[in-house]
């Protein structure tokens, strides 16, 4: 709040130094809405949206390399329709659809578990994609990157979100 008058007997102290960065004003508003929508506490959503350790500044964005065209280019068509459901074989690792999402720009890729998220993040990095693995690489996400993680990764900062992929948490593996 701006120009707040303190209660009598309370003296405000000037803010001398800002120690780090945190969630954007938009994420703060979203946390309030989510708390109202699911009758939860705002603090739970703010924890999900905040870095685990202090972050002095967002990481500098790496220059974007072209994302290679994978063998499953059929996934590119799914993103032409806005919202789509794509069915794949149970043993599919999700890399094809993830690469298709990354060809659109920075993507949010949600997986069922952290092991699968790590595996997918490594595969995307090998393909030349700038990846932030949630929740550990909050500063990288804030600087602009594809975010890979479990459902809580949806609270990571994404300044240039271009596509979202949810890899079914009810997968057959």
In which residue ranges do the predicted regions lie?
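Accessory, non-ATPase domains that flank or precede helicase/AAA+ motor cores in DNA-metabolism machines
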Residues: 1-173
């Amino acid at each position: 709040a701006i120009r707040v008058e303190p209660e009598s007997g309370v003296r405000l102290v000037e803010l001398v130094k800002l120690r780090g960065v945190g969630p954007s004003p938009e994420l703060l508003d979203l946390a309030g809405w989510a708390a109202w929508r699911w009758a939860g506490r705002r603090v739970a959503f703010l924890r999900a949206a905040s870095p685990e350790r202090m972050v002095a500044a967002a990481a500098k964005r790496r220059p974007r390399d072209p994302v290679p065209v994978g063998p499953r280019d059929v996934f590119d068509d799914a993103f032409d329709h806005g919202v789509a459901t794509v069915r794949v074989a149970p043993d599919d690792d999700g890399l094809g659809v993830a690469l298709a999402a990354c060809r659109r720009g920075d993507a949010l890729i949600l997986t069922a578990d952290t092991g699968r998220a790590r595996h997918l993040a490594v595969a995307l990095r090998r393909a030349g994609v700038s990846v932030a693995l949630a929740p550990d690489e909050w500063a990288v996400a804030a600087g602009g990157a594809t975010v890979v993680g479990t459902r809580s990764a949806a609270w990571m900062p994404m300044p240039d979100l271009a596509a979202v992929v949810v890899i079914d948490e009810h997968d057959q593996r």
